[in-house]
UniProtKB/Swiss-Prot annotation:
SUPFAM superfamilies: S-adenosyl-L-methionine-dependent methyltransferases. Disulfide bonds: none annotated. The keyword Cytoplasm does not apply. This is Uncharacterized methyltransferase YbaJ. It comes from Bacillus subtilis (strain 168). The keyword Transferase applies. Signal peptide: none annotated. Gene3D superfamilies: Vaccinia Virus protein VP39. Keywords: Methyltransferase, Transferase.
Length: 255
């Protein structure tokens, strides 16, 4: 495990402890409804993934990629999928384990990094669900290549990601409602922030983030062998949201 992966693992353990929105597991009634066939999941903050992005879910082998936290995996398992959740945070995985025990679900959990799926054989899954997470890896291209490898032919990859435009601005001024361009894209916390700020992030167990270009996010999937068949945009908690959607989601098919 490299230093970045190890650090962000601890950072996400901390996010679980502090109740970050992406770490709060779904309520029991959500699981009860999913067992009846009434379910939705999100890979971006506000919008549900369109139902027609999924094939009939029962019996499908689904990998929830960098998707711990008890939000996507348990819902899909309750709906009838054979679910594996891979995440870099043990405490995020514990959220899925807790829901599985509480609600009588079978969920396989694997601790690992989204850019190294060597624990899985080629063509192991029918669907990969990858919510906003690749902002925490330095290079997103291996994520797409590994996803392609472990998907079956005609398998589906559903991904959410941050629009890199959010990384252009001075974060301290943005917190005051002021948008001032300061950085370029691609962006990386360890290289683009002053050393003392990076040191503080590390000391405080705050996750290090990376703003990948749209070319790497979308063309990266195409270059890996996918055909992009669906797209939508969403909003989050940025000041910039009043001017442009700051999140995107794609549906891609392995051919």
């Amino acid at each position: 495990m490299n230093a970045l992966v190890a650090h962000n693992s601890k950072a996400w353990d901390k996010k679980v402890e502090t109740g970050n929105e992406w770490t709060v597991a779904v309520e029991q009634q959500v699981i009860e409804q999913a067992k009846k066939g009434n379910w939705d999941i999100r890979v971006t903050p506000m919008k549900d993934v369109p139902k027609d992005w999924f094939p009939p879910i029962k019996g499908l082998k689904v990998l929830c990629l960098a998707s711990g936290g008890g939000q996507q995996g348990p819902v899909l398992a309750a709906a009838g999928a054979d679910v594996t959740v891979l995440d870099n945070s043990e405490k995020q995985l514990n959220q899925d384990r807790m829901i599985a025990e509480r609600d009588g679900l079978t969920i396989h959990t694997v601790k690992g990094s989204m850019d190294d799926l060597s624990v899985f054989n080629d063509e192991s899954f029918d669907v990969i669900v990858h919510p906003v997470a690749n902002v925490f890896v330095e290079n997103v291209l291996p994520v797409w290549k590994e996803a392609y490898r472990v998907l079956k032919r005609n398998g589906i990859l559903i991904s959410g990601f941050v629009n890199p435009v959010v990384f252009l601005f001075d974060t301290e001024l943005e917190q005051q409602g002021v948008l001032k361009v300061k950085h370029s894209i691609p962006y990386a916390d360890p290289e683009d922030l002053p050393k003392h700020k990076v040191k503080k992030l590390i000391e405080n167990n705050e996750a290090l983030e990376f703003g990948h270009s749209l070319e790497d996010q979308i063309k990266g999937q195409i270059d890996a062998g996918f055909i992009v068949t669906g797209f939508y945009e969403d909003k989050g908690g940025f000041v910039l949201d009043q001017y442009i959607h700051t999140y995107s989601a794609t549906r891609s098919v392995k051919v």
